[in-house]
Amino acid sequence: MTIRTNTLKTRRRDLAQALINRGVNLEPIGKWTNVGLQVFESSVPIGATPEYLSGHYMLQAASSFLPVIALSPQPHERVLDMASAPGGKTTHIAALLQNTGIIFANDANKARTKSLTANVHRLGCKNVVVCSYDGREFPKVMGGFDRVLLDAPCSGTGVISKDSSVKVNKVMLLVWSSFCLC
């Protein structure tokens, strides 16, 4: 399991030490990120620590850091996250923007915006507007953006990591890969 440090509230080394003190066996993820921690085992529920509840980190796959790193948002920019729930990438963008600028966190599925809103608040993101539009409507609804993130859940990689039967079923793997818009 991996977690992403919320730099709006803490530093990775401080978070790591706090979790180690609670009985969590972890280490920083490689040189390509300064916010990721790999959790190997824990004597406490990682999604219920005081640090988690106060928004010091997000449970998030390390691969989900990459779209935001590639986007490279800069402070004071106007950013659209097209498929934002549950908010891992949106809150990562907010941290990189240092809570400046504005992020339009969109999810076409209105029901999913509940978890998105909860995470935005928990992590202390003050520059996020949560919305639920069909992406084709944005040109009609609001002006341009400095950056747009569309990490569409199309490749099935999340499903593959959670369902081992997909790994051995070539037909299912081909079905999932055919959905990729990349």
Residue ranges and their predicted role:
Residues M1-C182:
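S-adenosylmethionine
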